[in-house]
Swiss-Prot record:
Mg(2+) 1 binds at D187, D191. One of its GO terms (molecular function) is inorganic diphosphate phosphatase activity. Its cofactor is Mg(2+). Keywords: Calcium, Cell inner membrane, Cell membrane, Hydrogen ion transport, Ion transport, Magnesium, Membrane, Metal-binding, Translocase, Transmembrane, Transmembrane helix, Transport. It catalyses: diphosphate + H2O + H(+)(in) = 2 phosphate + 2 H(+)(out). Mg(2+) 2 binds at N214, D217, D435. This is K(+)-insensitive pyrophosphate-energized proton pump. The gene is hppA.
Length: 702
């Protein structure tokens, strides 16, 4: 296995090396005029100030958790938590660092034409993508190799890896929620006063919230998404390894089966690097086609890589599992291929619901012609409808892979889905860069043809941001299911080895709906995503309200802003939003951490351990089911509202300034926190609840 571990670490380092070289290429590009650099500098300053303050707050929470975990489970678990948290933080920070420097270079590149603008924008996204995949794989592989090297086996090997996933998750939920509150507080506030009240266009330098809006794009869509997918990747690989350690306990195949998800990650990272080389504009100037070509090459190369990984690691023949269960290497390979197919299908479905070429978005645009209310009604209808197809795809994947290889087959499917994370994050991080480039072009008064180029790049960026959210949610839902399987298998393992784990003596867990504790667990789990979403939406409403007041005050008290003779105080909005986002993110983020612990001890106090474990397991299922639907409906609905507004701005139903446009702006304002704050933050929330339950089992077993 030493050769496989070496390959996995080399592949992860190749991704980091690719990122470093690409950063060098981007930074060497022309950064435009002094005015463009001044605007970009303000965005850089705001983004750094926000992330520095956010990470300081997270560090305090992280330090407390580190001490508690180390005290309860030992230093290797505490160290695992630290590795997950630090690597997740680095992925988000470096991604943001490059995107706020690439924006001005994309705007300058757009002066040379569409091809140059696309090249720079995608390269900056690819840096974030490869960092996420490389760091996630490296952190899990490195720590696993280290633990094996010091002779850790059984729980001493598994618990530190679970803690690594928890560290990544904790950073992720803060990054997603804090970044989401900032970005949408700025966006909604800027739109309400700028577009609706003052009647000035988007990204107008006269709007005091315009810099905060551009900062928000980076901390939400770039740093937030990076931390989110880093965490999903790390958690899924860890959960798959946990299941491998249980399903192949005490048999020779255990080492190779624990290495298999790492090998899949390694080959798919190399496939993603290859895919980035194929993102080139063709003769038809089809930007989306160029991006999808890169994605398809990555998926095709991953398919070939998975064939090799399967042949070398488990082999295609029969594999002996624990308790005499037989697995087939070929069936596991099919499960991995299904993961690639599910990724493609989820991306296609999300584009259907959020793209301007399809019925859903056009129906919302048409509804805008009859007023604000009908726009909101149709948007809500689409948000609900958009949950059906992804759920059916996930159901089909679960049943097929379970028939092939049981729960371990499902885990391998999710692992191969996430192995494409590098390319998917690249598509996502492309979005905020092009959005910012458009803003810089507008504020620096660049010629109309440059603005047309940045608009074309940005329109595709809107679609890629929506599409990658669909992928992130689908993989998070399936990943959480793997964590739930790890919870039930852990329970069964502790119960079967009662001599070593006396705390589980007499525990009899079943998830029968005739048990009131199971029903209560389902209800409590089901309400968590709604409560969490409500907290996120309320926080954005409050933050946007304070931005509205501040922008109105500046229009009132600083004469000459509207004439363009006086400069607004941009820093005031950035500072206000930073404070608001950090204050508002703490309590919702602690909800999924504390809920499983509180529920377990409350039910334990009322009944017994069996009832408490049953209620806790049911709660995990409840969170997965409602969380998946809440997240899909919010992100797809918000994306449809946003693109319906863009569709009208392209000249349909009266174009900009028409009554339909005003109604569409209202819908977009409602959809903003839906798709960029509450919806995406439900992802890490689902997984944290599951990981805390796994760690609770480890503490009780300890």
């Amino acid at each position: 296995m030493a050769g496989i571990y070496l390959f996995v670490v080399a592949a992860a380092l190749a991704a980091l090396g690719y990122g470093a070289l690409t950063i060098k290429t981007i930074m060497a590009a022309d950064a435009g005029t002094a005015r463009m650099q001044e605007i970009s500098g303000a965005v850089q300053e705001g983004a750094s100030a926000f992330l520095n303050r956010q990470y300081k707050t997270i560090a305090v929470v992280g330090a407390v958790v580190f001490v508690i975990l180390t005290a309860l489970l030992g230093i290797s678990v505490g160290f695992g938590f630290l590795i997950g948290a630090v690597c997740s933080g680095i992925a988000g920070y470096v991604g943001m660092y490059i995107s706020v420097r690439a924006n001005v270079r994309v705007a300058a590149g757009a002066q040379q034409g569409l091809a140059r603008g696309l090249e720079l924008a995608f390269q900056s996204g690819a840096v974030t993508g490869m960092l996420v995949a490389g760091l996630a794989l490296l952190s899990v592989a490195f720590y696993y190799i280290l633990l094996v090297g010091i002779g850790a086996t059984g729980r001493a090997l598994i618990d530190p890896l679970v803690a690594l996933g928890f560290g990544a998750s904790l950073i992720s939920i803060f990054a997603r929620l804090g970044g989401g509150i900032f970005t949408k507080g700025a966006d909604v506030g800027a739109d309400l006063v700028g577009k609706v009240e003052a009647g000035i266009p988007e990204d107008d330098p006269r709007n005091p919230a315009v810099i905060a809006d551009n900062v928000g794009d980076n901390v939400g869509d770039c740093a937030g998404m990076a931390a989110d997918l880093f965490e999903t990747y790390a958690v899924t690989v860890v959960a798959t390894m946990v299941l491998a350690s249980i399903f192949f306990a005490g048999v020779p195949a255990m080492t190779s089966m624990m290495a298999y998800p790492l090998a899949i990650g390694g080959v798919c990272i190399l496939a993603s690097i290859l895919g980035t080389k194929f993102v080139k504009l063709g003769p038809k100037n089809n930007i989306m086609g160029a991006l999808y070509r890169g994605f398809l090459v990555s998926a095709g190369a991953s398919f070939v890589g998975i064939i090799l990984a399967t042949a070398i690691v488990p082999g295609f023949g029969d594999i002996q599992g624990a308790n005499g269960v037989l697995y087939s290497g070929f069936d596991l390979f099919l499960c991995a291929v299904i993961g690639l197919l599910v990724t493609g299908l989820l991306i296609w479905v999300t584009e259907y619901y959020t793209g301007t070429n399809f019925r859903p978005v056009r129906s919302v645009a048409k509804a805008s012609t009859t007023g604000h209310g009908t726009n909101v009604i149709q948007g809500l209808a689409i948000s609900m409808e958009a949950t059906a197809l992804p759920a059916l795809i996930i159901c089909a994947a679960i049943i097929t892979t379970y028939q092939l290889s049981g729960l371990f087959g499902i885990a391998i499917t999710v692992t191969s889905m996430l192995a494409l994370a590098g390319m998917v994050v690249a598509l996502d991080a492309y979005g905020p860069v092009t959005d910012n480039a458009g803003g810089i072009a507008e504020m620096a008064n660049l010629p109309e043809d440059v603005r047309k180029t940045t608009d074309a790049l940005d329109a595709v960026g809107n679609t890629t941001k929506a599409v990658t959210k669909g992928y992130a949610i689908g993989s998070a839902g399936l990943g959480a299911l793997v964590l739930f399987a790890a919870y039930t298998e852990d329970l069964a393992f502790f119960k079967a080895n009662v001599d070593a784990y006396p705390a589980f003596a007499g525990v009899d867990v079943n998830f029968s709906l005739s048990s009131p504790y199971v029903v209560v667990g389902l209800f409590i789990g089901g309400l968590l995503p709604y409560l969490f979403g409500s907290m996120g939406m309320t926080a954005v409403g409050r933050a946007a309200g304070s931005v509205v007041e501040e922008v109105r005050r500046q229009f009132r008290e600083i004469p000459g802003i509207m004439e363009g003779t006086a400069k607004p105080e941009y820093g005031r909005c950035v500072d206000m939003l930073t404070k608001a986002a950090i204050k508002e993110m703490i309590i919702p983020s602690l909800l999924p951490v504390l809920a499983p612990i509180v529920l377990y001890f409350v039910i334990l106090g009322i009944a017994d351990k069996s009832a408490a474990f049953s209620a806790l397991g049911a709660m995990l299922l409840g969170v997965i089911v409602t969380g998946l639907f809440v997240a899909i409906s919010m992100t797809a609905g918000g994306g449809a509202w946003d693109n319906a507004k863009k569709y009208i701005e392209d000249g349909h139903y009266g174009g900009k300034g028409s009554e339909a446009h005003k109604a569409a702006v209202t819908g977009d304002t409602v959809g903003d926190p839906y798709k960029d704050t509450a919806g995406p933050a439900v992802n890490p929330m689902i997984k944290i609840t599951n990981i805390v339950a796994l760690l609770l089992l480890a503490v009780l077993a300890h």
